[in-house]
Amino acid sequence: MKMQTVAVLGSTGSIGQSTLEIVKKTKKFKVVLIFANTSYFKIISQIKIFKPKIVIINNLKVYQKIKKFKKFKKLIILNNITNIEKYLKKVDITISAVPGIA
């Protein structure tokens, strides 16, 4: 059975982290996109563990710090959610755990 692809919006919050724990335990899903705001160390950890293809960081300072990592050169790292729809269209499941986003 093919793994389903998942996008987690709000990956560093409590619901996002719970979602990622389930993903890690089930082995039925592949996280391909994470969206987070300011939790620098959590974002770094999630990138290392889940190896998403796309990381969107809302906070400009955190985005700039993570963008400098040479290890993450193959990642698509964005600071703008304006065109997020084009990435979400390619994902099987989207978990929206961001307050104010439906």
Question: What are these model-derived regions, one by one?
Answer:
Residues 2-53:
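N-terminal Rossmann-like dinucleotide-binding module
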Residues 26-28, 70-73:
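Short helix-capping segments at alpha-helix termini
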Residues 35-37, 58, 97:
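Conserved residues at the C-terminal ends of beta-strands
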Residues 40-43, 60-66:
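Short, charged/polar "capping" segments at the starts of alpha-helices
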Residues 51-54, 73-75, 88-93:
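Short acidic/histidine-rich motifs immediately flanking catalytic phosphotransfer sites
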Residues 56-58, 74-83:
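Short acidic-hydrophobic, aromatic-tinged amphipathic segments that line or gate anion-handling sites
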Residues 79-102:
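Beta-loop-alpha module in the N-terminal Rossmann-like domain of NAD(P)-dependent dehydrogenases
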